[in-house]
């Protein structure tokens, strides 16, 4: 009678919140954070969706904040370029690969280098070679290794580093009909695909761990490449992973060919 007087139903009056209602959401959110510690909320929410959980965005974010995950330490924010030079997106794979070098150090202080190779079309990590020294001949060996399963690209984009402007690489590229495109000095935005990839790799691997040996770097990097290509959704790829995006377009091309 009292409920009818104030205009609420008996079920609403008797409602008691379930203290364990969010347990599964919290468990899966913590699992995602543990597996992808460098991801922010947006990426983590997409991971939960990819795992098949249809939970409401606001609900997940509320729990994300309740757990204090929004207060995790972040790296320095990179100031946006005043005059960005967006690269054209290739219409197919093997049109252009971008490559670059990075450097870091082991726990003992010894420096090492990484040679990073990225497919512009689907942002796929084609290779990361790691060693104390990576001369031009070593770069060519990595390229040949990738070419063996991927085919030759039409073009390679790079900066003017000594390994890239060497006659050895120029002769190899000419032999296989590959154009070498050098960006202008001081213009990293002209190689933005691999630059963005480098930042992600540094945030999630190089800055995340202390390495005692090169083999530790290689093992962690190999696992990260698999996750990056197979599990990580990309905003620029319709929230697909690099391999999913490539597979989608290969199927589309095959269906178009079948129609002609």
Where are these regions (language model features)?
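Charged DNA-binding/catalytic regions of mobile-element recombinases
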Residues: 1-260
